[in-house]
Amino acid sequence: MQIHRLIKNLMVIPLIGAFSFTGFSQNLDPYLQELIQKGLKKNQSIQINEINAEQAEIDQKLAKSTFIPKVTLNGSYTRLNDDITFDQETQDLLMATQKLLIKEAAGIPFNTPLPPGAELREPANLQNKNILKSSVDVDWILFSGFEVTNAVKASKHKASSLNYLGMAEKDKLAIQIITAYDQLALVYASEKVLETSAEYLKEQSLFVKKAIENGLATPIERKKIELAQQKLVGKEIDFQNKKTLLIEQLVQLTGEEKNQLEMMVPKLDFNRLSNTDDQEKRNEIKALEEAELAVQYKAKMEKSHFIPKIAATGHYEFLEKDLSLLDPKWYVGVGIKWNVFDGFQSHLKSKKTQLEGLKYRTQIEEAEEMIALSIVNEKLNYKSKVQTVKTVEKEVELAQETYKLINQQHKNSLASINDVLDALTELEKAKFKYEEAIYNQRKAVTALLHAKGTLNY
């Protein structure tokens, strides 16, 4: 069964952020939600899974249609080499019988000749050589020994399993889009940090220029600032390259127009969870449970092979002219079929299917254990990332104050330009670190809600 292979693949996803999610849409940017929906419509794997689910639903309808009467219209023309007649002795007997009946009706002795004008009919043919037939047949299964009933239930649960599996596939794609979107937001936030650093360097360049004019600084200090500015340009190019790659990734994932993605400016905001205890059953677990039920009903279907089956049949001839003397114009009947012994095949097939159900039960237990461990791990990771944001906030404050102090000292000739550039570098690093901490905190939120099955999109 295809569901087995797909679920097995899901089971080997890394522990962190490994399972599906279903209560986070209020914190997602509306445009991000739109991108996710476009991605869900575009993704080929999701489309294939939807087709598989639709096929399973058709299987269910096919099983139900077993109880619908089947009506067949028949038409044929046959020409024999000759009419089919009675043998000569039988024909003579039939003619003699006619004569006796005529004499009896006329009230004359049997041994007297036939009265004048008495007509004898030639014996009818058993079958004329030209045969034109038109008929209708009706076949109707009245009782399938519960095979059809169990087949319908098996198909129903298989379709449900594929639907849940499709939801899990959608979750995986949504996570990819959310991650790419947040990474793009991190790039934009980092570019703002570079813009601030560029403003600081511009300010330092103007100060050093005036200091050189007044003989208070050397051209070397200006060269150092120019070098720092070139390093910023290099970083900006790196961020532009990352932005281009991320936009291309979003184009591939969502099918959105590139120019539309280039116009958006995603924001990277801190996202705090109000409640980390809510939890729902994962789509993977639901898919496994439905698959388990499907094979259970399949086993019942195979086991019911020994139960008698009952069917009705009917036949009606529209044309009577060419019917043989032995053909009925219509008939109806009821039949029973009972497979008393099939060499243990049904029993062995049912046993094999039951073992397949045990495999699903084992996978369910394994998945539940993995989910429980994943939730604990993601809760700890979330708390750690929240604390990291608080710590880095203090680092940014300290770096900001340090830069202001050293910059003031430099203006009072108490610190060198190297000290100012070092302080600016540390401030820049602290801000980068802060934006990355926010990104990791958002990622931890997604991973936790994902693990608990409470992330919507």
Language-model-detected regions and their locations in the chain:
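Flexible glycine-rich, low-complexity coil/linker segments exposed to the extracellular/periplasmic environment
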Residues: 85-87, 92-126
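Flexible, surface-exposed loop regions and adjacent strand-edge segments
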Residues: 88-95, 268, 328-333
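Bacterial N-terminal signal peptides
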Residues: 11-22
